[in-house]
């Protein structure tokens, strides 16, 4: 899902583009039938179904070419996309999808239930990044626990709590296709229905026998069709799917290219080389403000639900002490950053979940208080140990606010240094726990409270068969219990209460600090 700022040219085509990008963009119309879209990160693969790791840029391109069985509506509820009807059995374990009529893939093949079954067979055969969402990770008592290795950012090595050995248990017991228009998923327990729907959103349905070609020549059922890819320039050419089942796009051609440098993107927008720049983009907020009203450029804003955050390695000294993490929470003036650096293109975050979520709970609030921060550092016995703050290189906006955060932390007596790394290196180090503080943005995933389990359950600490998402390596037995009860509850009111208790504990111990909700513009 897209999130972020939209800078646009004043014309109705913006609305057409937004219908496919689901959020923000920059648009300028030239004398051509092609619209050029810029992304700030390179897309490394088109096959997002079976890929081993997440690729945000590739997911954005994928959203133009593919459909899923399920999508989110404006209220973050799950509704059908390629499914026109979703029915649940009385026992809650059988979910039946009645498929849309008259859907065709880009190769002309009619869409049937066999394609859904084939897609999931390929997904589970690949054991890729997305397949893990359809499994529970549970303790494996047959294997001894493993202690993390000693690293630069985890210098206490053997003193760190042992990582429990785990195994995967499938959510889905069967997928049946009784006829061409019906797919029946059976889950192992009733509470997994909502997890199934949440996970189906990210699964692009592909035609039978097409898996081998998806990497180089993707074929889906979405509004745009793949034409060509220039790997040297990181440019993909798309054309309108004139037989698109949900209404043909009015834009004949779409070009998606990577522009990683902020100045280059600004120049291209002003010169007309780029029409749309969906966020996260690499344009700093001050540039966006200056571009608003410049020529035909305009910035429109509405509330966003994505979350910018700091994640702390809760197993790396001195951040293994909750008081150090709490001190950081009080040291950062988020309202000032939002007002003066982001020019109110965001709202300070009070939770990892957006306020629009049915499970939202504010938890412990960290209002700016330098005196409280210094007191906590004193109570923690902090002696000036160095702390490394890492983030991906190449994004001018991130660089601006990261330096402000570094300065704020050093002002209260912390010894923080910045290290910028290539994005893939950062991802690898996060998975291995080789960091202390990292800043990033979750796009879309935080709209469902199941996200709390992904971020804070000890069963989600990366390692072994687990690739996501408890990057803080946070462990709390009570949180594990509460969040599992919440995820498995079929009573929304009870689940809301349990998720609230979970966030109360987590926000107090603070393995992750919500910063702000970036605006969609």
Language-model segment annotations:
Residues 28, 411, 415-426, 431, ...:
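Extracytoplasmic/peripheral linker and loop segments enriched in polar/acidic and small residues
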Residues 84-132, 184, 268, 318:
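Aromatic- and charge-enriched surface segment that lines or borders ligand/interaction sites
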Residues 106, 186-203, 218-264, 285-307:
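Aromatic-rich, solvent-exposed beta-strand/loop patch
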Residues 239, 319-407, 411-412, 473-482, ...:
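Append "and occasionally in soluble cytosolic enzymes with long acidic Gly/Pro-rich linkers
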């Amino acid at each position: 899902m897209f999130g972020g700022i939209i800078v646009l040219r004043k014309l109705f085509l913006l609305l057409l583009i937004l219908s496919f990008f689901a959020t923000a963009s920059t648009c300028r119309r030239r004398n051509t039938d092609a619209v050029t879209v810029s992304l700030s990160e390179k897309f490394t693969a088109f096959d997002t179904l079976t890929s081993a790791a997440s690729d945000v840029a590739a997911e954005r391109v994928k959203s133009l070419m593919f459909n899923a069985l399920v999508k989110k509506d404006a209220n973050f509820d799950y509704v059908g996309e390629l499914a026109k009807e979703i029915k649940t059995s009385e026992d809650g374990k059988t979910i039946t999808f009645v498929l849309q009529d008259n859907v065709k893939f880009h190769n002309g093949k009619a869409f049937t239930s066999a394609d859904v079954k084939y897609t999931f067979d390929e997904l589970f055969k690949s054991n890729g990044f997305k397949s893990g969402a359809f499994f529970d990770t549970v303790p494996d008592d047959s294997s001894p626990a493993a202690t993390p290795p000693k690293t630069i950012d985890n210098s206490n090595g053997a003193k760190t709590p042992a990582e429990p050995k785990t195994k995967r248990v499938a959510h889905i017991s069967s997928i049946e296709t009784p006829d061409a228009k019906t797919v029946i998923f059976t889950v192992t327990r009733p509470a997994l229905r909502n997890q199934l729907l949440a996970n189906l959103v990210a699964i692009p349905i592909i035609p039978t026998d097409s898996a081998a070609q998806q990497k180089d020549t993707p074929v889906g059922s979405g509004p745009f069709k793949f034409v060509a890819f220039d790997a040297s320039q990181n440019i993909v050419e798309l054309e309108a799917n004139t037989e698109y089942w949900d209404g043909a796009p009015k834009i004949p051609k779409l070009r998606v290219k990577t522009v990683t440098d902020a100045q280059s993107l600004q120049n291209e927008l002003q010169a007309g080389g780029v029409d749309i720049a969906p966020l996260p983009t690499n344009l700093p907020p001050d540039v966006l403000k200056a571009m608003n009203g410049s020529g035909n450029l305009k910035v429109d804003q509405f509330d966003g639900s994505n979350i910018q955050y700091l994640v702390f390695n809760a197993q790396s000294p001195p951040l293994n002490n909750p008081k150090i993490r709490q001190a950081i929470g009080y040291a950062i003036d988020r309202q000032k950053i939002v007002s003066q650096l982001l020019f109110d293109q965001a709202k300070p975050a009070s939770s990892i979940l957006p306020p629009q979520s049915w499970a939202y709970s504010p938890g412990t609030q960290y209002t700016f208080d330098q005196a409280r921060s210094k007191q906590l550092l004193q109570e923690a016995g902090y002696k000036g140990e160095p702390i490394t703050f890492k983030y991906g290189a190449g994004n001018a906006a991130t660089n601006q606010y990261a330096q402000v955060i570094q300065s704020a932390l050093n002002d209260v007596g912390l010894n923080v240094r910045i290290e910028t790394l290539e994005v893939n290196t950062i991802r690898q180090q996060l998975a291995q726990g080789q960091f202390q503080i990292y800043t990033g943005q979750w796009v879309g995933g935080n709209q469902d409270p199941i996200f709390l389990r992904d971020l804070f359950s000890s069963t989600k600490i990366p390692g072994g068969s687990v690739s996501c998402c408890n990057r803080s390596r946070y462990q709390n037995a009570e949180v594990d219990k509460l969040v599992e009860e919440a995820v498995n509850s079929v009573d929304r009111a009870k689940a809301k209460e349990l998720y609230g208790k979970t966030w109360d504990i987590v926000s107090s111990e603070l393995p992750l600090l919500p910063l702000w909700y970036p605006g969609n513009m």
